[in-house]
Amino acid sequence: MAKKSKIAKAQKREALVAKYADKRAALKAAGDYIGLAALPKDSSPVRVHNRDWIDGRPHAYMREFGMSRLNFRQLAHKGQIPGVRKASW
């Protein structure tokens, strides 16, 4: 499990990205790069890192399911992920 402070920081970044999205798009369209540089660094969508929605783990993230491989494996073995079956060939 990720530290609570790291999860909170990631949520704060996501909120900043959402808050400045329209302003950032307008500045980009106008080509105002000085104005873009004046915005907070954390308002850039590039700085948002995908995290597991269960425990906040940042590594081994599976986009399709929104969780890390560890939690995916655990839930898949329990049969709690719809459409996922153990492979057999």
Swiss-Prot record:
GO terms for cellular component: cytoplasm; small ribosomal subunit. GO terms for molecular function: rRNA binding; structural constituent of ribosome. It comes from the Bacteria. Pfam families: Ribosomal_S14. One of its GO terms (biological process) is translation. SUPFAM superfamilies: Glucocorticoid receptor-like (DNA-binding domain). Keywords: Ribonucleoprotein, Ribosomal protein, RNA-binding, rRNA-binding. Part of the 30S ribosomal subunit. Contacts proteins S3 and S10. Belongs to the universal ribosomal protein uS14 family. Binds 16S rRNA, required for the assembly of 30S particles and may also be responsible for determining the conformation of the 16S rRNA at the A site. This is Small ribosomal subunit protein uS14. It comes from Leuconostoc mesenteroides subsp. mesenteroides (strain ATCC 8293 / DSM 20343 / BCRC 11652 / CCM 1803 / JCM 6124 / NCDO 523 / NBRC 100496 / NCIMB 8023 / NCTC 12954 / NRRL B-1118 / 37Y). The lineage of its organism: Bacteria, Bacillati, Bacillota, Bacilli, Lactobacillales. The gene is rpsN.
